[in-house]
Amino acid sequence: MNAPPAFESFLLFEGEKITINKDTKVPNACLFTINKEDHTLGNIIKSQLLKDPQVLFAGYKVPHPLEHKIIIRVQTTPDYSPQEAFTNAITDLISELSLLEERFRTCLLPLRLLP
């Protein structure tokens, strides 16, 4: 069969998680390739990027169902770098998800479902 080995969907070596390439087709844009991820992460990062008023375009694609990577394209205003927008989006997501986890744990404490 032509399917890749199962371990390829999650095994990742040092320094292979993300690559950043400048997009030469449009000004002030970058392509972020994130390995071993899928639509779940791509959509949440894209949505967070679009909340930033200095981001002109944010989109993602999965090149092929058998390739375990996503490509996120980000274009920003001239005074704001795509790398800075991406870093800010990730930082904001970490904060939001930490708050969600904290509130979830607070709701579960009265039910004694947590150790």
From Swiss-Prot:
A single GO BP: transcription by RNA polymerase II
Source domain of life: Eukaryota
InterPro entries attached to this UniProt entry: RBP11 (IPR037685), RBP11-like (IPR036603), RBP11-like_dimer (IPR009025), RNA_pol_Rpb11_13-16kDa_CS (IPR008193), Rpo11-like (IPR022905)
Entries under Gene3D superfamilies matching the protein: RNA polymerase, RBP11-like subunit
UniProt keywords, alphabetically: DNA-directed RNA polymerase, Nucleus, Transcription
PROSITE patterns to which the protein is assigned, alphabetical: RNA_POL_L_13KD
Entry's localization field: Nucleus
GO MF annotation, one: DNA binding
One Gene Ontology term, aspect cellular component: RNA polymerase II, core complex
Protein function: DNA-dependent RNA polymerase catalyzes the transcription of DNA into RNA using the four ribonucleoside triphosphates as substrates. Component of RNA polymerase II which synthesizes mRNA precursors and many functional non-coding RNAs. Pol II is the central component of the basal RNA polymerase II transcription machinery. It is composed of mobile elements that move relative to each other. RPB11 is part of the core element with the central large cleft.
Protein family: Belongs to the archaeal Rpo11/eukaryotic RPB11/RPC19 RNA polymerase subunit family.
Oligomer status and interactors: Component of the RNA polymerase II (Pol II) complex consisting of 12 subunits.
Name of this protein: DNA-directed RNA polymerase II subunit RPB11-b2
Species annotation: Homo sapiens (Human)
Upper lineage: Eukaryota, Metazoa, Chordata, Craniata, Vertebrata
